[in-house]
């Protein structure tokens, strides 16, 4: 009898060890892919920031894209730093740096979500009420909205850090409440508004395109593609705390979900530059143009003429 129990216990230990090895290998692969994605994202977003910040004349919509690229760059940098620190033992100094990178990462995440919500909402308003929006839109609205969103996200994430950082006055109950409030803001306000405005924009532009037999503008494609990629790739990170606290999942499943959410969110923050350049070069005869030309073409609002070109008049006055 004892021999039977010992053999069954040994088999269970071997099974658990084998399962743990598989989970460890899967996490290692996901972390490696996330690191590679972050490096590509840093290169792509740095290129967008350099082009929009120093090589191109800014338009109202390009200001949003510039700030979104900055938020994405901060996110992938913090993610890459965390992945790098996790490959070595976390001593006192590296542990503090890891905590700082984690807080900055969530800050960049909320900034990116807020900017995408503002972009999709303003594009929706400009399509639903074009004359009113053009006449009543403040000249520096884009810059003011971006600055306000950065400050609000800094405030909310600063409060979260005060209650949840293990190097400050950590309180588990208060941290849980603050996390739930922030999750409710992300999942209950920002994400639904972004989704609803994007769906409205898609239906309205699609109907107008069928009625007037015109192709949608490249800017419309850029906005919808960016929102779609965010919803598919970045929402798993937003749902992470819900999965951690409310779903009674096995520890191995939670670890795999956590690593998968880090990879998918890294892909989301790295995909936007690729979207801009793919849309900017789509149906164009001048594929050999500079990167700045391709990016400028992707951010234009004007409908395309024959050959994939756009009118040159009023380019810098039109914005989203």
From Swiss-Prot:
It is found in: Cell membrane. Co-expressed in the small diameter neurons with P2X3 and VR1 in dorsal root ganglia. Pfam families: 7tm_1. Glycans are attached at residues 2, 6, 16. PROSITE patterns: G_PROTEIN_RECEP_F1_2. Coiled coil: none annotated. Its main location: membrane. Residues 55-62, 134-142, 204-218, 281-320 are cytoplasmic. The chain crosses the membrane at residues 34-54, 63-83, 113-133, 143-163, 183-203, 219-239, 258-280. It is a multi-pass membrane protein. Residues 1-33, 84-112, 164-182, 240-257 are extracellular. GO terms for molecular function: G protein-coupled receptor activity. Keywords: Cell membrane, G-protein coupled receptor, Glycoprotein, Membrane, Receptor, Transducer, Transmembrane, Transmembrane helix. Residues 308-320 have a biased composition (Low complexity). GO terms for cellular component: plasma membrane. Residues 301-320 are annotated as: Disordered. May regulate nociceptor function and/or development, including the sensation or modulation of pain. Functions as a specific membrane receptor for beta-alanine. The receptor couples with G-protein G(q) and G(i). Belongs to the G-protein coupled receptor 1 family. Mas subfamily. This is Mas-related G-protein coupled receptor member D. It comes from Macaca fascicularis. The gene is MRGPRD.
